[in-house]
Amino acid sequence: MDIVLVGLNHKTAPVDIRECFAFDSLEADAGLKELSRIPELTEAVLISTCNRVEIAAACQDPDEGIAAIKDFFSRTKSMPLENFEQNLFVYKGDEAVQHVFRVASSLDSMVLGEPQILGQMKESYRLATQAKTTGAVLNRLMHRCFMTAKRVRKETGIGDHAVSISYAAVELARKIFGELTDKKVLLIGAGEMAELAVEHLLNHRAAGVFVANRTFERAVALAERFRGTPIRLEEVEEHLKIADIIISSTGAPGYVLEKKDVKKVLRARKNRPLFFIDIAVPRDIDPAINNLSNNFVYDIDDLQGVIDRNIDERQKEAVRAERIVDENVIKYRTWLEGLDIVPTIVSLQKKLEAIRQAEMAKSLANIPEIDEKGREAIERLTQSIINKVMHDPIQFLKAGGHREKQKKEVLGFTRDIFNLNNPQNGDEFTPDEE
């Protein structure tokens, strides 16, 4: 049994190709049912997100399994293989396992360390188990992959550093204020990044939001969304006295707030820090405000600089994460290789147990005077002998199982020397008459 993986992602395929291969939940369910009917695949999991579509499968012949998955993509998406084969990546064995673990640990994501991918993979696994397309091999793979991702999150700082403008703004605010629980936010203007920054601040328990906009109707709508208070642009200066964090994104041709505007409220603020996040281009906030005591202005370039430094930090943490991934690849491979020897070990155990039971019955029949205590002693003695006899063959099989080229020979030799292919083994074993 081996693991194969075939797929495409943001690194290998443009968005127009990726969107052709995306599976929604209904399509994924139908796709899994189709995968279950492919004889070359023993088990399968379909992973589909906005940035990747991949199929991990267990199969007896890796090359046949890979070809079957390529054909599945071509048939289900009605696209000739030659139109997309150059966009596919193909892994087998340890490389396939490593890829699954790296994806779950967010080492293969567009944004290194982003947390969403693990939840998406758990959902993919849930759909596969629901469709009954997984068994012992992929169940073990996915559980180990989730454990690996959890260790990466716990033992490294790969997700600790903000790598988006909105998160970087929150990170800076926390450095200035510490806890944000009593801090008030003033949003001037609108825009996706500014609104996301407000959402993140509220998620960190900021005390409330004032919303000012060029049109008061828009301010009312945004305030309702954030459960805040709408104000008119003319009221912004007055609210500088009570706000702690100013987020501005108006797109106005000149500064919305100048140094003189802030200087007017310094006495009323009693030296409390004021943090400005200027996401507008051209800028809304006069950079000269930085020269005022306890006033901090960060524009889009400053925030990007924070992100660049944080990406470097995540890259350093990724080195530690890769080590955790590689460690778990080895552990999974050891388990998978041992899987092939289990039937032989079970057959050997059944044969020896049948011999033990038969010889016990014959011997005890010749000593009818033996009491229950004596029977238990003989039971323990014979069981101990069987366990000791089994020890060396099991260790031999496990050692041989690590060498792929010798595995079949080792298993065949063991079955021959113990005559395990004899249909009279196990429960039907009959000892030779003396």
Swiss-Prot record:
Keyword Oxidoreductase assigned: yes
Record InterPro entries: 4pyrrol_synth_GluRdtase, 4pyrrol_synth_GluRdtase_dimer, 4pyrrol_synth_GluRdtase_N, GluRdtase_CS, GluRdtase_dimer_dom_sf, GluRdtase_N_sf, NAD(P)-bd_dom_sf, Shikm_DH/Glu-tRNA_Rdtase
Enzyme Commission no: 1.2.1.70
Top-level taxonomic group: Bacteria
Record pathway: Porphyrin-containing compound metabolism; protoporphyrin-IX biosynthesis; 5-aminolevulinate from L-glutamyl-tRNA(Glu): step 1/2
Binding-site list for NADP(+): 189-194
Pfam families referenced in this protein's UniProt entry, alphabetically: GlutR_dimer, GlutR_N, Shikimate_DH
Catalysed reaction, written as an equation: (S)-4-amino-5-oxopentanoate + tRNA(Glu) + NADP(+) = L-glutamyl-tRNA(Glu) + NADPH + H(+)
Gene Ontology annotations of biological process type: protoporphyrinogen IX biosynthetic process from glutamate
Site (described: Important for activity): 99
Subunit-level organization: Homodimer.
Other remarks in the entry: During catalysis, the active site Cys acts as a nucleophile attacking the alpha-carbonyl group of tRNA-bound glutamate with the formation of a thioester intermediate between enzyme and glutamate, and the concomitant release of tRNA(Glu). The thioester intermediate is finally reduced by direct hydride transfer from NADPH, to form the product GSA.
Protein's UniProt name: Glutamyl-tRNA reductase
Species of the source: Desulfatibacillum aliphaticivorans
